[in-house]
Amino acid sequence: MNCISDFFTYETTKSVVVKSWTIGIINRVVQLLIISYFVGWVFLHEKAYQVRDTAIESSVVTKVKGSGLYANRVMDVSDYVTPPQGTSVFVIITKMIVTENQMQGFCPESEEKYRCVSDSQCGPERLPGGGILTGRCVNYSSVLRTCEIQGWCPTEVDTVETPIMMEAENFTIFIKNSIRFPLFNFEKGNLLPNLTARDMKTCRFHPDKDPFCPILRVGDVVKFAGQDFAKLARTGGVLGIKIGWVCDLDKAWDQCIPKYSFTRLDSVSEKSSVSPGYNFRFAKYYKMENGSEYRTLLKAFGIRFDVLVYGNAGKFNIIPTIISSVAAFTSVGVGTVLCDIILLNFLKGADQYKAKKFEEVNETTLKIAALTNPVYPSDQTTAEKQSTDSGAFSIGH
C-alpha cells in the first residue's frame, strides 16, 4: 500500500525567499557565468544562431610553370610533372635514376641481397626482385655472383647517387579553386574580382604581403610547410596545400575569402629509415626496326602536392536561435540547484531552510484544517482580492 500511496502523489514547487548575502552573491555569480558562456561562446564564437552547411563542393585545377636543367638536359613541365592533366594531386620530379635500353631476357640481379654461391640459394623461397627467378646462380661481375632472373635486362641499380634539379625551387604553381555551399546555393572562387591579368604575371603568394595571390612558388610552399628544399628534393615527400573556406553568410559576399595553410602529410614516413620520402617508377617504351621492344626505366623522386579544400558556411535561422535561447534560459536554473545544495548542507540555518523548503500535506491534514478554519467560496474570493501575500516564505539571517 505504501508503494501505491507514494505513486499517487503530487509535488509542486514552493517559493522560499532566503535573505542571505552569501547565497545571494553565489546565485548571481553562477547566473552571470552561465549567461556569459552562452553569450560569449555559444552565440558569438560558435554562432549557435546560424544553420551551417558543411557539405562543401569543390573543384581544383592546377598548372605548374618553369624549366630546369637535369643531366645536361633542359626539362620543361611535360618532363617533370605527372599527371599532366592539372588535377588537385600532382608530382614535381626532382631526381631520377635512369636505367636505359632494357630488353626482355635473362640477366643477374644487381642487388646485394641476391648474392649467392650455388643454385640452391636461388630457389622460389627467395623474394622476387626485378623479374622471375630462374633458380640459377650466375656471375654478376668478376667478384660477385647473384641469382639470375627472367625479365627486363639489365636490372636497375638504384643505389647510385644522382643530382637533384635545384631549379624546381623557383617553379610556380597556379591554383584555381571553385567552391559551392549547396544549402545556400552560394558559389565563389579563389580568383577574387580585384585580381587583374597584370597581377597574375607578377604576384606571388605570401601569407602576410599577398595572401590572395593564386600563384605559389614551390620553394615558398616547402618553407611554409617547415621543410628544407634540398633534403625534400633528394628523398621526395608529400606536401599538403590546404585551402579553407569558413564563411559567415550574414556578412557581405566579399567577406567570404580563402585561407591557405601548408603541412607535410607524410611526416611519419620521413622519420622511417626503411622507406623515407616518396618515389615511384615509370617507363618509356620504344621499338627497334626489327620490331623488338626496349624501354628506359626511370625511378623518380619528387615532391607530391595534395591540394585539400575544406570549409563550412553559416547563416541566420530562427530555429537554431530559438533552441539555443531556450537552452540558455534553462541553464540559468543550474544556479538554483547549486544554491539549494549549499543551503541544505553547508550554510548556517540549514535545518530551518529544510523545514520551510520541504513540507508534506496529506488528506488528513487538509480535513483538520478545513474543520478548524472553514473558508466559503465567497469569503475566499474576498480574501484573494485583499491579500498582498505572494505565497512565499521569507527566511532572514
UniProtKB/Swiss-Prot annotation:
Chief location bin: membrane
Consequence of changing residue 178 to F: Does not affect the inhibition the allosteric inhibitor AF-219
An annotated GO BP: protein homotrimerization
Extracellular topological domain: 44-322
Positions with a binding annotation for Mg(2+): 111, 158
Impact reported for residue 267 to A: Does not affect the inhibition he allosteric inhibitor AF-219
Glycosylated position list: 139, 170, 194, 290
Localization, UniProt: Cell membrane
Role: Extracellular ATP-activated non-selective cation channel. Plays particularly important role in sensory neurons where its activation is critical for gustatory, nociceptive responses, visceral reflexes and sensory hypersensitization.
Domain remark in the UniProt entry: Contains extracellular allosteric binding sites-distinct from the orthosteric binding site.
Subunit and interaction comment: Homotrimer. Forms heterotrimer with P2RX2. Heterotrimeric P2RX2/3 has a ligand dose-response profile that is distinct from either homotrimeric P2RX2 or P2RX3.
Protein name: P2X purinoceptor 3
Native organism: Homo sapiens
Organism placement in taxonomy: Eukaryota, Metazoa, Chordata, Craniata, Vertebrata
